[in-house]
Regions:
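A short, compositionally biased
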Residues: 17-23
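Short beta-strand elements of ligand-binding domains
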Residues: 1-5
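ATP-dependent carboxylate-amine ligase
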Residues: 8, 20, 28-31, 35, ...
């Protein structure tokens, strides 16, 4: 197994977390000890990299050769996966494709660790998908951020206003005094967060990731 649990055969330990990368050490049987970093934010991303390395070793690749190949970091570009799109000035901005409660939890925790100021979250929920997870997503978003901006994603054939209301009501129930805004067009929602944020703050645009389209009634 590869995890961070005490009884695992392989362990991923985080050695550094910055807005630009996460450094880790992978320790395993027979003294295997591999150090590297991923150009992604979050311990969960380092754990994914560790699992990939374990799979290579279990497939017969030499651990020392793997270490030599990735000693200076793993070169990867994954659009929309805690992707940092920060400009030269202003707040840190991250785009993440995750659209589940677990994804929200991990990504918000990662952003919080590297943010000195407030954490803004701009998010919505897809239409014609599992509606039962929407209240939980909104609860996690509310508990993990300082300012929420609820917007539309891909409403498909659902009423986007109804989706937003479900998210808004669940967020208010979780944290009644939280600063929450409802802005339907995603472009306007992002602009709202940028206008409110200050240097030292961070904005997480969660859900559609790198997608540059919207699915509205097909």
């Amino acid at each position: 197994t590869s995890q961070m649990g005490v009884d695992a055969d392989w362990h991923v330990g985080i050695t550094a977390e910055t807005p630009a990368y996460t450094s880790f050490v992978l320790a395993g049987p027979e003294g295997v000890n591999i150090r590297s970093r991923v150009p992604l934010l979050g311990a969960h991303m380092a754990a994914n990299a560790g699992l990939a390395i374990v799979m290579l070793i279990e497939a017969g690749f030499d651990a020392e050769r793997i270490q030599a190949a990735i000693a200076n970091g793993i070169d990867a570009y994954l659009p929309g996966r805690t992707e940092r799109v920060t400009g030269e000035t202003g707040p840190d901005v991250y785009v993440d494709f995750g659209h589940s409660p677990d994804a929200f939890l991990n990504t918000l925790a990662a952003v919080r660790k590297v943010t000195e100021g407030r954490v803004f979250m701009v998010f919505g929920a897809d239409g014609d998908r599992d509606a039962s997870k929407r209240p939980e997503m909104a609860r996690i978003a509310a508990e993990g951020s300082d300012v929420l901006v609820i917007t539309d994603h891909h409403p498909r054939f659902e009423d986007p206003a109804s989706i937003r209301k479900t998210l808004f009501d669940a967020a208010v129930a979780a944290r009644p005094n939280l600063e929450i805004y409802e802005v339907s067009p995603p472009e306007a929602a992002i602009r709202k967060a940028v206008a409110l944020a200050q240097p030292g703050d961070a904005i997480l645009w969660a859900g559609p990731g790198h997608q540059d389209y919207r699915d509205i009634r097909g």
